[in-house]
Amino acid sequence: MTAQLFDSHAHVDGPEFDADRDEVLARARAAGVQRMVVIGAVGDPSSAERSVALAERDPNIWATVATHPHDVKGLTPEWWAIHERLARHPRVVGIGETGLDYYYDHSPREAQRDAFVKFIALAKQVDKPVVCHIRDAHDDARAILREHLPAGLGCIIHCFTGTPDDARAYAELDCYVSFSGIVTYKTAQPLRDAVPLVPRERLLIETDCPYLSPVPKRGKRCEPGFVVHTAEVVAREAGLSYEELAAQTTANALRIYRLADA
């Protein structure tokens, strides 16, 4: 039996999958990816609505909702009302992705910080974990998390791209740390060095599809089934067998997303 995996962060709601979404999901399950969380946070709230709709029709898919830090400059009261409504949906298991992206700065940094704090507050209201997008902003992100994230609420640092020291610092904040296909890239040795610094009970894996296809699939549209390649590398760096890594990261995803009975 193929080891079961959980893709903790995917964007299969997007238009990149409109032509073959069912086939993509079938390939994922054939590869052992039995569960996934679809992140409804790209652009306007239609992404959140699509993600929730997808989760409603598939018992092994769940959704999150928020506005990506790239797009918070357009976060209107109308958008916010949609997020508040969807955040309470029973198939929504987290608030995100939210956070800070100082690499692209598509939205002003002050707007990013303000939105991050607001989405953490929304997560507290609905008692669901926060899914964080943090790029080149780890010090500011940790300062916000220390001040605003309630103990026990839960936080995922998705697509971790920080240093080993950053990984250690997030672990000290009791955050879960998720590794994407980037960890398989030749130039990503610092990421691989970070893997053993994350407590095993806080490790997650993801595709972030359709982006960041892992080796040996680079250059192709990423899809959930490709998480097997990320799992192989993370298992090696964590000192686990593939089967142990699959079981551990699946248990971790079920715990942080509060899906223990799923």
Predicted regions and their residues:
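Mid-domain alpha/beta scaffold segments of enzyme catalytic cores
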Residues: 1-262
